[in-house]
Amino acid sequence: LALDLGTTGNRAFLFDNSGNVISQAYQELTQYYPQPGWLEHNPLEIWQATCTVMQKAIQQAKIKATDIQAIGLTVHRETCLLWDKTTGQPLHNAIVWQDRRTAFHCQKLQEQGYAEEIFVRTGLIIDAYFSATKLTWLLEQVVKPSSINLDNVLDGTIDSWILWNLTGGKVHATDDSNASRTMLYNLTTREWDTKLLDLFNIPAHLLPKIQPTLGYFGTTKPDLLGAEIPITAILGDQQASLFGHGCDRPGLVKCTYGTGSFLVARTGNNIIHSQQQLIATIAWTQNNSNDTTKVGYALEGSMFTTGACIQWLRDGIGLIDNAAQTEMLAQQVSDNGGVYFVPALSGLGAPHWDMNARGAFFGITGGVKRQHLVRSVLEAIAFQVKEVVQAINDSGLLQVERLKVDGG
């Protein structure tokens, strides 16, 4: 049973022993925008949707829970929350990876000269995208003004929250791939970095235990599905895509087109600190039989709004009725009519990392039609990916040998 917990919805897939999908289920998630630039999810809705898709997939497959050999979990990364370990209740909505509320905090850290140290320790560029400043905000804005006892609080990314619920509160853990996206994880030691915990004022006891990506994370509580099913893999969604494409050596690269687009290049056993504004991250880790851990690294270019731009064309300004319409409209004109779109609806990610950038259309004249605007948005998505591929090649440390593509 594979659980794919995405930004816009949760999916469950059941595979047979030959790797064929025998059933699947999907449930959309509500997106909450309390202020411009903010995005939240209801953690209880995420958990309930997870339960729903698991049960639907099992029912559709007409199997028993005892037939399921193992559960694997992949999640959208960086999104994080706090919850009460006694009641199991979230203390606030989860702050989603696209949320920009902590941009000012990030700018302050840059001005104070922390950029290089954080880059060396974590492989990441200071940005509101990552979890650290989100957790600081939650502690300062939710916990500090209240009478909440910090000894009763747990924090984590979505994988930790779902794992904790799957196991009935028995396991508070994460894997290396998700931990490496928090800006609190030391990429070299593969542990929570005490200096960064102090910098972000995050008590160490709140954090989940870091475990290898492919290993043992406990079992589901018996009354959840009707059996104790072992949980044997947890990955960040983009690392899961890299694994699924078989990108197991340097030069193999994948690009996923979803809410955002994420281009990830396997770098083998080496941490590559790119000077081209790309981030270093864990690909995945695995338990060896001799109690050692096999570690793989990757280089990533994160582009925040690609599919989200198409969603905005539909829901925000009503230029299209559905996503499929974009191709038809784009093909009705021979070029973009001189119109260019900046896809910075949530700032710009790699290779620019500009939290203050905003989306814009340029080159509009009286002859521009709806088709030109739609085409310029599609072209902007392609231009972003080209920039990141070029940045990888320009690093001089890695050449893109093969690029694999998926979407969701």
Language model segments and positions:
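Short, acidic/turn-prone active-site loops that include or flank metal/cofactor-
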Residues: 27, 95-102, 260-261
